[in-house]
């Protein structure tokens, strides 16, 4: 190495040689260590002596390469120096490692194939087979609302619902009917007040008398503007309030009726007195006899 | 005609029912205009008669196609199912409008009503009397219609007959009790917003109970004529779906209008 360094200053050609040699040395060192590690990985079961022997062999190879470099001329040295390391490493690694790696890959591929086969088999069984659309409904075909499997009809379903219906639901209806109608009581109605929002009549109805609703109840439903039917004169319901003239006329008629009533009442009183007196006379005669 | 075809769909035959149905609907809505303006319901009644005759014969033809002619393949049945589902969805939204009106008024009653719910002058029903009995009746009818359905899927003819019979009977009983409640009501449809929303919601529910009862009765008659098999009975399933829908609407009605709003 020192000779080569000294030659730099004497002749520039040898400088190139030094650079190449340094690179080769570093490469050879790395490769030798790499091969050692590979050997150790591949030959895990071997002894330490065999590993030492491998190291010695690599050292010997390195020495041989160095000797070759010194002897050859510069041009020839370039060509020969590059090729040997590659060949050495390739031969050493290739022959040992593949047998261990390939089986693993093959087993994994086989497993994948097996899984895919299983999936295919399962998929066929689980896949829903759609019914042909041209199939006419009826017969032994499946239900229209369900695709694929026929529904597993179990007789217990209808029996279950029959029991629920006949022994659970219908008796409940009967019991509730008895409870409701036995505890039912008539409610009192509210006092009539002619609220603006109640008893709305914007037009007359097209049925009945035009003032009563379809489900009119004479006791509970009041009629505007008077109120409940059994509290007011029905003939006046829905009519306009009377005017002053009508009121005066009505009062005149009322006065006439009152006068007639008084006359008749006075006459009736006199007649009653006469009858009473006559009755007393007859009573006295009978007592005298 | 042969039942063989190279496609699963039902290419319908010529039929007069869409035309007569349209005529019936037009006559009905024209009759409503006449009714509201001239107090005359004759045209309205005529429209309803035309519509009823149309739907009867249209569904008769559908039953014949499915039962005797074998035209209801799996694909056709799927279409009928989606049709029924969408119809029930439209009914749900129909009732949402009544509940909306009720909650609009009941959650913030106006000052004119006394700022209270029920409004002043209203006595509400006792929810634990006949309304509770009606709730039990509808729930019971849900159980009996389920019994009929399971029996039908197990090819048990007599049990299906009994289940359907009890379901129809309970529907009629519900209607009778509801009519009794209407007659005994201490308020009318004209008594404030309470009476209006109450009778609109419960009235339309009552009409739907009548429709559902009729639907189930038709299924009972078809069953007695051996129209259904254990695999092909969508008409019955549609009636059961509709009946369960009516039941659920009543639960909402009972909880919100009778119980909470009472």
Swiss-Prot record, chain B:
Span-the-membrane segments of this chain are 39-59, 83-103, 120-140, 163-183, 198-218, 240-260
User: SUPFAM superfamilies, alphabetically?
Assistant: Cytochrome c oxidase subunit III-like (SSF81452)
- Enumerate the Gene3D superfamilies for this protein: 1.10.287.70, Cytochrome c oxidase, subunit III, four-helix bundle
Family of the protein in this entry: Belongs to the cytochrome c oxidase subunit 3 family.
Which CDD domains does the record match to this protein?
A: Cyt_c_Oxidase_III
Q: Which GO terms describe its cellular component?
A: mitochondrial inner membrane; mitochondrion; respiratory chain complex IV
Which proteins does it associate with, and in what oligomeric form? Component of the cytochrome c oxidase (complex IV, CIV), a multisubunit enzyme composed of a catalytic core of 3 subunits and several supernumerary subunits. The complex exists as a monomer or a dimer and forms supercomplexes (SCs) in the inner mitochondrial membrane with ubiquinol-cytochrome c oxidoreductase (cytochrome b-c1 complex, complex III, CIII).
Q: How is this protein positioned relative to the membrane?
A: Multi-pass membrane protein
Query: What Enzyme Commission number(s) apply to this enzyme?
Result: 7.1.1.9
| Encoding gene (name) | mt:CoIII
Which BP terms from GO are recorded?
mitochondrial electron transport, cytochrome c to oxygen
Among PANTHER family, the record links this protein to: CYTOCHROME C OXIDASE SUBUNIT 3, CYTOCHROME C OXIDASE SUBUNIT III
Q: Which InterPro entries match?
A: Cyt_c/ubiquinol_Oxase_su3, Cyt_c_oxase_su3_dom, Cyt_c_oxidase-like_su3, Cyt_c_oxidase_su3-like_sf, Cyt_c_oxidase_su3_a-hlx
UniProt superkingdom: Eukaryota
Q: What is this protein called?
A: Cytochrome c oxidase subunit 3
Q: What's the catalysed reaction? A: 4 Fe(II)-[cytochrome c] + O2 + 8 H(+)(in) = 4 Fe(III)-[cytochrome c] + 2 H2O + 4 H(+)(out)
The cellular location(s) given in this protein's UniProt record come to: Mitochondrion inner membrane
Keyword annotations from UniProtKB, A to Z: Membrane, Mitochondrion, Mitochondrion inner membrane, Translocase, Transmembrane, Transmembrane helix
